[in-house]
Swiss-Prot record:
Interacts with the late transcription elongation factor VLTF-4/OPG110. Interacts with the late transcription factors VLTF-1. Belongs to the orthopoxvirus protein OPG125 family. Pfam families: Pox_Rif. The gene is OPG125. It is a peripheral membrane protein. Transmembrane segments: none annotated. Induction: Expressed in the early phase of the viral replicative cycle. GO terms for biological process: response to antibiotic. GO terms for cellular component: membrane. Its main location: membrane. Keywords: Membrane. Gene3D superfamilies: Adenovirus Type 2 Hexon, domain 4. Signal peptide: none annotated. This is Scaffold protein OPG125.
Amino acid sequence: MNNTIINSLIGGDDFIKRSNVFAVDSQIPTLYMPQYISLSGVMTNDGPDNQAIASFEIRDQYITALNHLVLSLELPEVKGMGRFGYVPYVGYKCINHVSVSSCNGVIWEIEGEELYNNCINNTIALKHSGYSSELNDISIGLTPNDTIKEPSTVYVYIKTPFDVEDTFSSLKLSDSKITVTVTFNPVSDIVIRDSSFDFETFNKEFVYVPELSFIGYMVKNVQIKPSFIEKPRRVIGQINQPTATVTEVHAATSLSVYTKPYYGNTDNKFISYPGYSQDEKDYIDAYVSRLLDDLVIVSDGPPTGYPESAEIVEVPEDGVVSIQDADVYVKIDNVPDNMSVYLHTNLLMFGTRKNSFIYNISKKFSAITGTYSDATKRTVFAHISHTINIIDTSIPVSLWTSQRNVYNGDNRSAESKAKDLFINDPFIKGIDFKNKTDIISRLEVRFGNDVLYSENGPISRIYNELLTKSNNGTRTLTFNFTPKIFFRPTTITANVSRGKDKLSVRVVYSTMDINHPIYYVQKQLVVVCNDLYKVSYDQGVSITKIMGDNN
């Protein structure tokens, strides 16, 4: 060994007390044994809107503690005609609400969307929850006996505060019966389909078949001590209103803000959906592919099957077609002599006033080339130059034909319209499918009457993505960075006498062009506050809401 290194050790001061970094004193832990346990639930239809509810009762004299809940859901075989697929992460999107209760009341609960948000950075959990090409790609049935989807089982990890530090954070039963209750979303929320699919029959026959699994711990001579948990509370603002308020805030560890689109029962039909592939490019490619069959037509005469308002022109020999102030170049090879190439110049258009700006989807294409196949009677497109974006793909079909549009907005063929898809994904955020468009330009949070935080940029969203390693478009103020379990979480604390017991959020929505149909997508502000509770085991399992620093 090098002399310099040897001398640096020999010359060290031996009188200083030093900690051993080459070994630790092993401690003998509490004697326990874990086991995977599964049980079936009792199904009812007692939800607020006759939703299905599953209740699982856990009471075993040998189970001292539990955590890591996993819900198994069976998806049936799907047969029939039409286009059909499950929304990505279908297992999570089946869930409306989860609660864990004892005889003393609810211990912990969470909305389905917040559960999904908490697990969005766990790729394994997302995969097992129903993210696969077999489930999510749009499949087609051509006859009533065609199998569109094979039966499958998905597994939903229900992330709870009892999982944070395994045995330390586990929920101790304290000889109590624990009930886990899962409220499910309507079946319409978890499927994507076209109008030819017999959804009414599918909905009647669909039955949620859940099973709950968890890790149960048998512990010898357990010494139970009180602990703290965070419980999320969600408030949804009024439609298109920029404010939302969470009341009775006494000790909060974080506050999250995001927006959701509100489509209603008539605005959930869209032109396309990519299925399993979920990148922004996949949404755009699926949309462009659907439009091209109506946009460029090879026919032996003026195309038929379109509304009278459709403006379809024959492409001249030079291939250049002018649409208002834009030119589109079209070149299709191998066209038979008795046929011509036509371009649809007002496929989808929107405007709020005549003789003013018109949002015309046809104008977003600048060059289209391809080859016509006489055998298949279809055009194989080789190169498409366009400016279609994720917002275009996210426009509900109903907005093209809404009363706000002074033009005949949807001029596609009847055949194309029949392929439109009903999408009722309950966890969409923002105003586009990927939540790329940041529609909040300013955020202000007040605690009582005092301004707690304000921003003109998305810094709270950036920090949320960095800290959680997830990209879900949520803006979060975090008041607690204390290591969990071993310390009481840090909170923003109320002062009721000064009116500081509510968090009020106000946003300024980004300016958008009123001639763009996406401007008219209704939205709701969502605020989620994590309240701090103390878990006690004196007489069964119970929780107490923390009311201040001294609790």
